[in-house]
Structures are given as C-alpha cells and as structure tokens.
Amino acid sequence: MFHTPHPAISLLFAFGLIILVLMPLLAWFLLHGHHDKKSQLWFAGAALYAGTALLFAFQYRLPSFLAFTTGSALSVLFYFFTRASMQAELEDTQTPWREYVYLTLLFVLISSSLDWLNLRKTWGLLFNSVIFSWLALINCRLCLRVQRQYQSRGCFVLVCMFGTFSVLHAIRAGLTVFGSHGVALLDFELFSNIFLVCIFLAAICSS
C-alpha cells in the first residue's frame, strides 16, 4: 500500500493515519451538540492536517501536484484554522479569512512554480520548511498565551506540538542550506526517521 522498505513500516504508517483521522472524528461525535465556533475551527484544522497526512502517505501513487503542492497548502490552512480557533479563545475579533485565502493562494503559486522548475527538492523544500517553521512558531506563541490565561494542560501539550513542528522545520531548512541535500521524509535514513517519528508523535498529541 505504501512505498516503504519494510511491511512493518507500512503498518506504522497505517496506524499513524488511523489515529490522525479517527481521533478527531471520535472527539467530534462525542462532543456532538456542544460545538461552538472555536471547536469547529479547531476540528476543521485537524481535518485539513489529516488530509495532508493522507496525501503524504500516498505520494508515490498520486500526481506530484496533488501529493506535494495540495498537501502543503492543506498544511498552511491547518495553521490558519488552528490560529483562528486560538485567537477566538483570547478575544472576540473577526478572523481575517480574506488575508488567509490570499496568503494560501500565494503559497500555492510559489510552490507550484518551484515544482514546475524542478526545484522542489532544493528551493521548494527550503521554502516549505521556512514557511511551516514560521507558521508553527506563531501558533506556538499564541497557544502559550491561551495556556497562560486558562492554565490548561491540554494547551501545554499543544505548545509542545507547535514548538516541535517549528524546530523540526527550522532544522530541515538549515540542513537544506548547509547540508548536501534536504531531508526527504521518506528516505528512511537517520535524520528522516527521527523527523518522521517526531512529526507523527506531535500530530497525534494534537488529535
């Protein structure tokens, strides 16, 4: 099913995807009738990230644009939706959806251009890593504000999750600039395995 060097790794992939997809769905149904705007935004973000994970897992069976550009765009929207949810926890302000849409379209345009120029594994990887590290850092700081206001242990877990995402993508960007090549998550080498496990654990925590 998955392009992995061993069936055990395929099983790990399947297990991680099941958790990423089913846990938010289970929480949604358990909280049926108690969804406010903030929780709806958060669950929408979780659904977008689950979509990213599915496209990533099946990247070798999908067209490049769908697997990488669309998957990365869903990740950008994941950060925007979760940011909107946390912002609603802190203050009653209007979410700048128009700006989010424009920024996402700009991201897709740049990412598609780099892919078309066959630069996805160099400049494309660097561009994605920098953007994701920055977005995760913004969400980490915002989540820390929510955690301090409500003294929530769950928010502390989310702070760790966004912090992990930010650090991992920053390291990946650094390795792309100063290393011989970037870290491709499905290379199944030392760095790629560490990155993949950390991303899975952080994503599961968010669920």
Residue spans for each PLM region:
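Hydrophobic transmembrane alpha-helical segments in integral membrane proteins
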Residues: 1-21
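Signal-transducing coiled-coil linker helices
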Residues: 197-207
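Juxtamembrane segments at transmembrane-helix boundaries
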Residues: 20-39, 53-193, 200
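Short aromatic-rich membrane-water interface segments that cap or initiate transmembrane helices
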Residues: 3-10, 188-197
